[in-house]
């Protein structure tokens, strides 16, 4: 822009001079400058820019803009660029439609961008001043707009470009190898031509691309479904999604990833969810039945991509789980073993917990569905609370199960999961109390620690009110041990004899234990009765004012029994009932572990050889139901426990049947435990009805107590609100029906704890 002129003086006198810009410019001068610039622009477009002085061109453009001829320069530029693109570039591209189209277009695009960068540099001052003042497109963008409108969006070029790109992608989807670079270049060009927006790319490529893809995937889904199992279909869809993502990454603009994936998801998953899930011999149920955790995980991952996908899976899983659960708890198997019943439910829960962890990502929806399903079918069977208590009873009893304390702990934790699903927790509590009492009183608990651990679990779950009675039972046992130590010391000190009876008495607090209000009668034999009377006198002397009532149904005894050998057969051989050959007429001694009722019956046979059912009933005064059960255990049990024989030899016990001691009785064991018939099967129907009646009576009191508590604090309440509040308070123990609550409210009104308001009969007030 400047030149140095030679001076005659010393070096100091040499000065740099800037050539002055003309003050005014006539039209002729302006035209000559424009011609110079126009020629330069055309040379740049023809790639003949090596001879141009960019410095001079910049100065000329600067001069034009400075003297207010920016518009002429801007308009002229637009015309020159437009002319070149129409006459030269567009023609070249049109000529290449059937031969190297994308390469030609890409070359033209690259040349145009290079030219526009040079032109922009020359006209930089116009960009800074004229463009800013007049709010028009800058030089480079102007070039892009003209290229877009005159070349890329020119009728047949636009159509051909779109079709070429779509064809190449369609071919690649079918497995052909295509020029990915050419696709990428074209897509980048369309994005740049949108001038920082994506409208050109979207309209000229993306929208038709998505439309074509939808049609393609629609057809592909039909083909995939017809030819593949659910698991293979899922893998193919997964592969298709990954392929589309990879194509976007290498060929298209990143912004296309989301919409194309949505198209794949809609066409290959959303539209066929039910079909995939319900596929026969390969769908969700097939996977659940056969424990295919990996296939389920793939299905979960795929379905989690689409709206309602997991809901569809959940619904199908739920109907299968409910079907399985209902089969387990169905009433059909009346002789169902409670331990097997609960174990079946625990196994089912374990299976679905595994699916939840390994396949369903511990998803909340699946978790809630599984919990809801278990709650649904567990409560279909009214025996579930009793059976759960019997299951826990089985695990907490001493026995040859070979379980470590840790294994027992794990089983109890699983049982607690079922307990949480149980609506009638008060029924469970009643049975648990019975079974715990039996374990404690027969010294059958595997360990005190395990028992207390279980009570602590129940306490955590339901609060101390739920377990206070159970804890009271343990306190009674501890106090009883101390009392028995004191009693034995008293016997030693006084020299009183119990007549050969080794007596252990457990003194139980009535409110804690499942004692019976009307204690079953029983004429205890003289020897144990005498021993107990000595204890009674000792105890009441220490605790005046207390009353001791024998609970025969909860007691047990160890009897020394002598059997006098088998009967000789006609051939002279001797055989015992158990099938073991016995020689000689040697007697066999056993200790029989029996209930108080069984002891009372067996001790009769010290006096006489035979008794009829009626005679036993008369002598013992045992209630008929208890007597039948005791005799069945003694005379109709396993051969290794059959210490009595009866005539006739039927399973039933009826009046007129005759009982004798079975002198052929043999057992490999010295101590023989006489099992109570059907003890593991839970209660009989009459017993169950009785328990249910007791539960209902307890519930009446609990419901009334809750109503009074609520009304005392709220003073006045509308009927429906009170019912809802009572239900909320009691649901941790049982679900009271609104009808029962209404009856209890009416009972309280009759007893004047509550009153109806005169203005509204459905509103109650608390009567202090």
Curated annotation (Swiss-Prot):
GO terms for molecular function: cyclin binding; identical protein binding; Notch binding; POZ domain binding; ubiquitin ligase complex scaffold activity; ubiquitin protein ligase activity; ubiquitin protein ligase binding. Coiled coil: none annotated. Disulfide bonds: none annotated. Neddylated. Attachment of NEDD8 is required for the E3 ubiquitin-protein ligase activity of the BCR complex. Deneddylated via its interaction with the COP9 signalosome (CSN) complex. There is a cross-link at residue 712 (Glycyl lysine isopeptide (Lys-Gly) (interchain with G-Cter in NEDD8)). One of its GO terms (cellular component) is polar microtubule. Residues 698-760 form the Cullin neddylation domain. Residues 2-41 are annotated as: Interaction with KLHL18. The modification N-acetylserine is found at residue 2. Pathway: Protein modification; protein ubiquitination. Forms neddylation-dependent homodimers. Component of multiple BCR (BTB-CUL3-RBX1) E3 ubiquitin-protein ligase complexes formed of CUL3, RBX1 and a variable BTB domain-containing protein acting as both, adapter to cullin and substrate recognition subunit. The BCR complex may be active as a heterodimeric complex, in which NEDD8, covalently attached to one CUL3 molecule, binds to the C-terminus of a second CUL3 molecule. Interacts with RBX1, RNF7, CYCE and TIP120A/CAND1. Part of the BCR(SPOP) containing SPOP, and of BCR containing homodimeric SPOPL or the heterodimer formed by SPOP and SPOPL. Core component of multiple cullin-RING-based BCR (BTB-CUL3-RBX1) E3 ubiquitin-protein ligase complexes which mediate the ubiquitination and subsequent proteasomal degradation of target proteins. BCR complexes and ARIH1 collaborate in tandem to mediate ubiquitination of target proteins. As a scaffold protein may contribute to catalysis through positioning of the substrate and the ubiquitin-conjugating enzyme. Belongs to the cullin family. This is Cullin-3. It comes from Rattus norvegicus.
